[in-house]
C-alpha cells in the first residue's frame, strides 16, 4: 500500500525510491508489527479479561499448570493483526506469493479461532472436533498446494531441493501437491503441539521465520541464487516483508507471553503461524531445511506420535506425558528451564539450516 504511494511520490522527490529496497521494507515490517503488538497488547488483554475469554487447562496435565486456568487466550489474534497490517502497508500487493501466504495464514487462523472459541464457550480443552479441524486444514492446505502447482512458471518451483548436496534435486511433478499439503498441515499442527508453555512456541517461530526470510531474500535475487546454488524463485523476495512482520509481531507478543504469561496465543495463533512457515518454505523450495530448523516442532510432534502408537500397541507409555515438553516438566525441570533450553536448541538448528546456503 505505502509502496504504491512511494512510487507515486518519486516523481516529486527521488528520495522516495529508497522504499523500493526489500531490505528497508523488511526492517519497516519488523518495526511496524512490533509497535502494533506492543501498542495493542494491553488493550487486547484487558478486553479478553473483561469478556472472560480464558484458557481451559487439562485436569490430567502437570499440576503446576492449574494456576494458568483463566489466563486470557486467543492472543494469536494480536499476532495476526500486526502481521496483516504491517504486510499490507509495506509489501508489494501485486505479488502473488504475498497474498498466498497471507490468505493461508488467515484461513488456518480462522480454524484456530473456532477451536479456541468453542473451548471458551464450553469451558473445556476439547474445542473443535479433530475430524473437523483436520478436514478444514486439508481443504485449505490442498487448495494452496494446487494453486502453487498450477501457477508455477517453471519446474524449478516444483522440484525438491536436498540441502548439503548441490547436484541432487528431485522433480516432483504432481507429487508437489502431496508434499506441499503435508508440509503446510504438518507445520501448522506441529507449532500447535509445541504451544504448551509460556513463550515456548513463539520464539522458535520467530527464529525460523527470520531464517526463512533470509532464504526468501536470496531466492528472489537471481545473482544470489546462482552464486549460492539455490532455486531462483522470482517474486519470492517480497516475502521478506511478511517474515519481518512475523518477527516483529512475534517479539511484541512475547513481551506479554513470557513466563509467567499474561496471555496465550491459542490455536488461532499457533495453527496460523505454523501454516505460514510451511507455505513460505514450500515457495522457496526449502522444505527439508524447514524440517531441520524447526526440529523442536518435529520433536514435539514425534513425541505425540510415539506416545500414542506405543500405548495402543503395548499399553505402555514411552514418555511421562506428551508432547515432550510436559515429559521434562514431570521430570522436575522448572518451566523456564524447559523453555530456554528449547530456544537454545532452535538457535543451533537455525544456524545449521542457514549453513546449508554454503555447505554444498
UniProtKB/Swiss-Prot annotation:
GO cellular component terms given for this protein: plasma membrane
GO BP: any one term: cell division
Needed co-factor(s): Mg(2+)
InterPro entries assigned: Glycosyl_transferase_4, PNAcMuramoyl-5peptid_Trfase, PNAcMuramoyl-5peptid_Trfase_CS
Keyword Magnesium found: yes
Top EC group: transferase
Protein name (record): Phospho-N-acetylmuramoyl-pentapeptide-transferase
Disulphide bridges: none
Pathway listed: Cell wall biogenesis; peptidoglycan biosynthesis
Membrane topology designation: Multi-pass membrane protein
Protein's cellular compartments: Cell inner membrane
Any one Gene Ontology molecular-function term assigned to this protein's record: phospho-N-acetylmuramoyl-pentapeptide-transferase activity
UniProt-listed Enzyme Commission number(s): 2.7.8.13
Source species, domain of life: Bacteria
Membership in a protein family: Belongs to the glycosyltransferase 4 family. MraY subfamily.
Reaction(s) catalysed (UniProt annotation): UDP-N-acetyl-alpha-D-muramoyl-L-alanyl-gamma-D-glutamyl-meso-2,6-diaminopimeloyl-D-alanyl-D-alanine + di-trans,octa-cis-undecaprenyl phosphate = di-trans,octa-cis-undecaprenyl diphospho-N-acetyl-alpha-D-muramoyl-L-alanyl-D-glutamyl-meso-2,6-diaminopimeloyl-D-alanyl-D-alanine + UMP
Transmembrane segments: 25-45, 73-93, 97-117, 145-165, 168-188, 199-219, 236-256, 263-283, 288-308, 338-358
Purpose: Catalyzes the initial step of the lipid cycle reactions in the biosynthesis of the cell wall peptidoglycan: transfers peptidoglycan precursor phospho-MurNAc-pentapeptide from UDP-MurNAc-pentapeptide onto the lipid carrier undecaprenyl phosphate, yielding undecaprenyl-pyrophosphoryl-MurNAc-pentapeptide, known as lipid I.
Organism field: Pseudomonas putida (strain W619)
Keyword set, alphabetical order: Cell cycle, Cell division, Cell inner membrane, Cell membrane, Cell shape, Cell wall biogenesis/degradation, Magnesium, Membrane, Metal-binding, Peptidoglycan synthesis, Transferase, Transmembrane, Transmembrane helix
Amino acid at each position: 500500500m505505502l509502496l504504491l504511494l512511494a512510487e507515486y511520490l518519486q516523481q516529486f522527490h527521488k528520495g522516495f525510491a529508497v522504499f523500493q529496497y526489500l531490505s528497508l521494507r523488511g526492517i519497516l515490517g519488523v518495526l511496524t508489527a512490533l509497535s502494533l503488538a506492543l501498542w495493542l497488547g494491553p488493550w487486547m488483554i484487558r478486553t479478553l479479561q473483561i469478556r472472560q475469554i480464558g484458557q481451559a487447562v487439562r485436569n490430567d496435565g502437570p499440576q503446576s499448570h492449574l494456576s494458568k486456568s483463566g489466563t486470557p487466550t486467543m492472543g494469536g489474534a494480536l499476532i495476526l493483526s500486526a502481521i496483516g497490517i504491517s504486510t499490507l502497508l509495506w509489501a508489494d500487493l501485486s505479488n502473488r506469493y504475498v497474498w498466498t501466504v497471507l490468505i493461508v495464514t488467515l484461513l488456518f487462523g480462522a480454524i484456530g479461532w473456532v477451536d479456541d472459541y468453542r473451548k471458551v464457550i464450553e469451558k473445556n480443552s476439547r474445542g473443535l472436533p479433530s475430524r473437523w479441524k483436520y478436514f478444514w486444514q486439508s481443504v485449505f492446505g490442498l487448495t494452496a498446494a494446487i494453486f502453487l502447482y498450477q501457477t508455477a512458471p517453471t519446474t524449478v518451483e516444483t522440484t525438491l531441493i536436498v540441502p548439503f548436496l548441490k547436484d541432487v534435486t528431485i522433480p516432483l511433478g504432481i507429487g508437489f501437491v502431496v508434499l506441499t499439503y503435508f508440509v503446510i498441515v504438518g507445520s501448522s499442527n506441529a507449532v500447535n503441539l509445541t504451544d504448551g508453555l509460556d513463550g515456548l512456541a513463539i520464539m522458535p517461530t520467530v527464529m525460523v521465520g527470520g531464517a526463512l526470510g533470509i532464504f526468501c531474500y536470496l531466492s528472489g535475487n537471481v545473482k544470489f541464487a546462482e552464486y549460492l546454488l539455490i532455486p531462483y524463485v522470482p517474486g519470492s523476495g517480497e516475502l521478506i516483508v511478511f517474515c519481518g512482520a512475523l518477527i516483529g509481531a512475534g517479539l511484541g507478543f512475547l513481551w506479554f507471553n513470557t513466563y509467567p504469561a499474561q496471555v496465550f496465543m491459542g490455536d488461532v495463533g499457533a495453527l496460523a503461524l505454523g501454516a505460514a512457515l510451511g507455505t513460505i518454505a514450500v515457495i522457496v523450495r526449502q522444505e527439508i531445511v524447514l524440517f531441520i530448523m524447526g526440529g523442536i516442532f518435529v520433536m514435539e510432534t514425534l513425541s505425540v506420535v510415539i506416545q500414542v502408537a506405543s500405548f495402543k500397541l503395548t499399553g505402555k507409555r514411552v514418555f511421562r506425558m506428551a508432547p515432550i515438553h510436559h515429559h521434562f516438566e514431570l521430570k522436575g525441570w522448572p518451566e523456564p528451564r524447559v523453555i530456554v533450553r528449547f530456544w537454545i536448541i532452535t538457535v543451533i538448528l537455525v544456524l545449521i539450516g542457514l549453513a546449508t546456503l554454503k555447505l554444498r
